[in-house]
Amino acid sequence: MDKIQKIKGFADLFPPDSTVFSFIEETARQVFSRYGYKELRVPVLERTELFCRSIGEETDVVQKEMYTFPDRKGRSLTLRPEATAGVMRALVEDGRASEGLAKYFAYGPMFRYERPQKGRMRQFHQIDVEAVGSPDALLDAEVLLMLDQYLRALGLKNLVIELNSLGCKACRPIFLDTLREFLKGMHKEQLCEDCMRRKLSNPLRVLDCKVPQCKEFTADAPKITDHLCPDCADHFAAVRRVLDGAGLAYTLNPRLVRGLDYYVRTTFEIVSGDIGSQSSVAGGGRYDGLVHSIGGPDVPGVGFACGMERLALLIDKKAEPAPDFALVVLDAIGLERGLLLAQELRAAGFSGEAPYAAKSAKSQMRAADKSGAAFCLVLGSDELAAGTVVVKNMRAGGQETVSQDILPAHLRARLVAGQED
């Protein structure tokens, strides 16, 4: 019978990769909670309409990349390609989107049908952060400062913050008309097939195209930051003042538009020079019309997402911590007592394993040595009768016979002594 294998573009995570993912998640909890964010968990499966209305019908995500299928009643469902829309749906449905400032973070798997490559999988994982209820530039700046602190807590270096403003519903249409006029005369020798389609329907996305010829022929395209209305210009200036005051370096990138249609005003991306072509590790911005677009109140919001696979590429993978003990049972009659002794040690805070079936002393000692355990605990018939155990120090050498009653205290003292040496 043929082996069943995982789907292309999906991955199994074993240590040390799974350990790195746990570190990314735990660090997120620690940092974001200091800013008042609470953890939220939302479904991975949503109605397709949610993403069509929030992300935009003309985006590559909706047009090409979503995993969409009918359920048994013919309703169109989609595995989430990003987290923000689902978080907004949850806040609206639960009535939390209109209760003042709502600050939440979430994490988990997303799904996009893309060509698998380093740092980009069909199932990928994101850390998602959303703050809903305030239009203020200071919140935008604080979100960026929090993101910077989070990435620093992960130990990441060689990162660049790219910053832009996309204007609002008052000034962006004027800029889009100017951009369409600039793109109107361009032909297929100058723009890729996607950009030829987008230049009228979604011209902003042409600026974000990564195809070299498109970048070359749009190098002199008008800049949206030159067409901001006074309110958007003041908002963007306030964001930059706070970042400057905090000493946070950034680069202005007038071509930064992101891949989702709901962004307005502040938009940003964090890029790394250490992971090749998939250089973006985090990105986000303001989305003041998103909640209203999915049937909620007209409230503003700002947030970001971090790609966990890409973060993991930048984090040093440490070896799994070695266990404190490995129990060796010399006689089958001692297996049950050995298991109970191991249980007592775990309850006292130690990590380690005990055998479940009779094995030779040689194979057990070999396994104990391979595990890297600090102590090998030997339980034979003599020790079983006397209520003792032989403690072999696998790092400092030597061995002692110790009463089982004081074993936890003995191991703790030896571990402390070993740390001090």
From Swiss-Prot:
Any one Gene Ontology BP term: histidyl-tRNA aminoacylation
Pfam families named among the record's database cross-references: HGTP_anticodon, tRNA-synt_His
Subcellular location per the Swiss-Prot or TrEMBL entry: Cytoplasm
Enzyme class: ligase
Cellular component aspect of the GO annotation: cytoplasm
This enzyme's EC code(s): 6.1.1.21
Catalytic activity of the protein: tRNA(His) + L-histidine + ATP = L-histidyl-tRNA(His) + AMP + diphosphate + H(+)
SUPFAM superfamilies, sorted: Class II aaRS ABD-related, Class II aaRS and biotin synthetases
Classification via CDD domains: HisRS-like_core, HisRS_anticodon
Entry's Gene Ontology molecular function annotations: ATP binding; histidine-tRNA ligase activity
Disulfide-bonded cysteines: none
Swiss-Prot/TrEMBL keywords: Aminoacyl-tRNA synthetase, ATP-binding, Cytoplasm, Ligase, Nucleotide-binding, Protein biosynthesis
Subunit (UniProt): Homodimer.
UniProt similarity note: Belongs to the class-II aminoacyl-tRNA synthetase family.
NCBIfam families linked: hisS
Identification of the protein by name: Histidine--tRNA ligase
